[in-house]
């Protein structure tokens, strides 16, 4: 049976709507009928066919890894799921046999493969994943929100790596993940949450999500913002979401002694760092990759159930046949999360 899918068909700029064979599930898998998908920054990299994509993405391949759908098939060894369950899923497929997997630290699996990156993705009418990777969506959480659980998980993992209650938090990079991390920080009790970027559209979006200050670093100095807020010692926690070297070095400059930094943004490999700031301030830096399985997922659901409102981050919806408009919108930088509807 042929189904619709968005695929990387050629080693050049673009994504194409095509037909592929419906995937077949194994004994330990679920077959999921996709309802909605969201476009990730990674999908934009794949669309643009940048240096990372050229090294990483097999062609041809169905892409995409942010989704919500309904279980329509269950492998014979699978327990705990029923036909009709609403699910999203962890996009990192882990090996199960390395030391970290066996020690319960599956997000650190050295043999991880990615849905829509190294194996068939979710931009399709149907997806097969290991049942281990599926996460049931509680009633009361909308399909729209469920479809962005993957990037929301990046935000939650990054933000909740350190205690935020009563702390002053600096977030560099107001992409959708940075903005969601800011909303999480405010929701769990941070005092001042300051986010920086140069994109006014996204800074306005951050204001709608409740940040203390959204700072365009082209027009305003962080030192002046800290002074306005009555901060005399620097930020307690930093969340680096941009991969921008000057943003990271500005963060180091403005951290308090003993401050803690989560790094999610991917910088150039030759980024220059003022390590004296790290050493003499006694800073702690933690690299963040993906989501903790599945502690982050439970936290995500609980945060929404306890009143965290992420709806402003979803700014655009398109039918799957209009996927090109969705990618154009994401590439323009004038959007939050963009949802593609498969129904």
Swiss-Prot record:
Pathway(s) per entry: Amino-acid degradation; L-threonine degradation via oxydo-reductase pathway; glycine from L-threonine: step 1/2
InterPro entries: ADH-like_C, ADH-like_N, ADH_Zn_CS, GroES-like_sf, L-Threonine_3-DHase, NAD(P)-bd_dom_sf, PKS_ER, Zn_alcohol_dh
Ligand binding (NAD(+)): 177, 197, 202, 264-266, 288-289
Coiled coil segments of this chain: none
Cofactor(s) essential for the protein: Zn(2+)
Residue numbers annotated as active site: 42 (charge relay system), 45 (charge relay system)
GO biological process, one term: L-threonine catabolic process to glycine
Cofactor notes: Binds 2 Zn(2+) ions per subunit.
Pfam families named in the record: ADH_N, ADH_zinc_N
Residue numbers binding Zn(2+) 2: 95, 98, 101, 109
Protein residues bound to Zn(2+) 1: 40, 65-66
Catalysed reactions listed for this entry: L-threonine + NAD(+) = (2S)-2-amino-3-oxobutanoate + NADH + H(+)
EC numbers: 1.1.1.103
Family: Belongs to the zinc-containing alcohol dehydrogenase family.
HAMAP family reported in the protein's UniProt record: Thr_dehydrog
Function: Catalyzes the NAD(+)-dependent oxidation of L-threonine to 2-amino-3-ketobutyrate.
Complexes and interactors: Homotetramer.
Designated name of the protein: L-threonine 3-dehydrogenase
Organism: Aliivibrio fischeri (strain MJ11)
